[in-house]
């Protein structure tokens, strides 16, 4: 996917069901399991996005896995759900949805977009560098996209962190915000959203 992220698709022996926001447990070593967000809609295949910069057992497994390898996994787990409002029109849906992700935190949102996007959905992503941006490398149809790049300015992006963008543009109190990413960043983003009077649901990794 890029030098820091592996995009892994696993074929299941039979169709499985899960909700956007849930995760799978993957055996990455004989006695070690790691949780990874499910990045695809339910079905016969499972998509995982794995950050390999950590150099841990999960990163080593993701770096070494090859086509045809057998993988032990269990799913689904988790109670953090990203509502898809399936069968609901934009007019009927109670709240606008704004998704915010850093790095592989985009994974559960990809599952949500596969299950059903709405015309008023917004996806805000944050990266240090443009080469870390995953949105141009996924085949999942995305909603309106806002990219925040904190280092060098780039055309078509907001120059700064996601927190800078939210402070500059303001919070929509009529929206529901879904936030996923590293704990510190998610905490800072959630505080801004809550201070703006909006609903926020978040998950960290």
Q: Where are each of the predicted segments found?
A:
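FNR/FR-type flavoprotein reductase catalytic core
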Residues: 57-205
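Ferredoxin-reductase
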Residues: 1-74
């Amino acid at each position: 996917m890029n030098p820091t992220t592996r995009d892994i698709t696993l074929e299941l022996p039979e169709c499985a069901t899960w909700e956007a926001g849930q995760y799978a447990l993957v055996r990455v070593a004989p006695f070690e399991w790691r949780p990874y967000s499910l990045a695809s809609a339910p079905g016969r295949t499972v998509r995982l996005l794995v950050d390999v910069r950590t150099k841990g057992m999960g990163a080593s497994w993701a770096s070494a896995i090859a086509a045809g390898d057998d993988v032990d996994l269990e799913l689904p787990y988790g109670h953090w759900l990203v509502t898809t409002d399936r069968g609901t029109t934009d007019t009927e849906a109670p709240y606008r949805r704004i998704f915010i992700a850093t790095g592989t935190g985009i994974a559960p949102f990809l599952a949500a977009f596969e299950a059903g996007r709405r015309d008023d959905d917004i996806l805000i992503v944050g990266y240090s560098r443009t080469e870390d941006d995953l949105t141009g490398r996924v085949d999942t149809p995305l909603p309106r996209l806002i990219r925040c790049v904190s280092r060098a300015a780039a055309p078509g992006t907001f120059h700064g962190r996601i927190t800078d963008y939210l402070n500059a543009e303001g919070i929509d109190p009529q929206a529901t915000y879904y936030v996923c990413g590293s704990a510190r960043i998610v905490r800072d983003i959630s505080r801004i959203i809550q201070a703006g009077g909006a609903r926020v649901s978040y998950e960290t990794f």
